[in-house]
Amino acid sequence: MGIVVIGDVFIDIKGYSLSPYIPQVRNAGTVIQIHGGVARNVAENIANIELKPTFISAVDDNAMGDDVIQKLKRHKVETKYMKKVKDGMGTWLAVFDHEGDVVASISKRPDHKPIEQILDEHGDEIFKDADSIAIEIDTDKEIVKKTFMYAEKYHKEVYALVSNMTIAVERRDFIRRTACFVCNQQEAGILFSEDYDHMTPAELAAILPDRIRFAKISRMVVTMGGDGAVFVDSDGHTGIYPGRKIDIVDTTGAGDAFFSGVCIGLTYGKTLQEACGIGTRLAATVICTTENICPRFMPEEFGLTR
């Protein structure tokens, strides 16, 4: 069944200013609408490495929802468990400045009950043959609880990322049960109630081993934008994976792509450092385009065997 990805579908509406963005005035630019959502992006990224994931989610019961499912199918994502319901998808509206950074955004979350129903109806068959599980740790709490229940029943590793750290920080008990938790520098500071914003990778690498050991987190990766990522496990092994020098067009989806690479690498036998290398490469391909997913690769390009 491959990697099982659990989470939301969003429709992303993105506006790009052609000159320095000025709030409260009309800024000339372009507006595009694309399929998004953290979990949807992760599922499509994994599929674009020809690894055929299964996606557990919901879409709107309309033509837009049909379009989302058909695109996922074309990319070889297994969609048979997805539900079509009212308010099945969320919406994310974002404005970018001329340098590709988000300057304003609003989001509407979808109804999560359909995903919970999918797990109730098909949980055993979904989890028993999964290679691993990828989930947004800040999704509905009942979904997270059921995910870990089934994952532990069938001895599957769970890899987690976050889109809202203020919710995720209340899920520390679940984060402890993950095989690896991936977040950014600011989110790591929230998790450990500290300020990491001005730390260098070396400074962060020096303190993270104690932080995750005391918190009983098995493995953690903290992304630091252009400075790369710091990775650490509970045995005290730590390292820094450098970032790539690229021209930034749009940073949307870069974190999702990085997480996808880490999840792929760890699921299919790579070390934490090697998995960060896959994530860094995928993130770089997203940042230099307006797309929020990576292009298609063959698994052999990353030393993966199917």
Residue ranges of each PLM-predicted region?
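Short, basic and Ser/Thr-rich N-terminal targeting/leader segments
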Residues: I49, D87-G90, G225
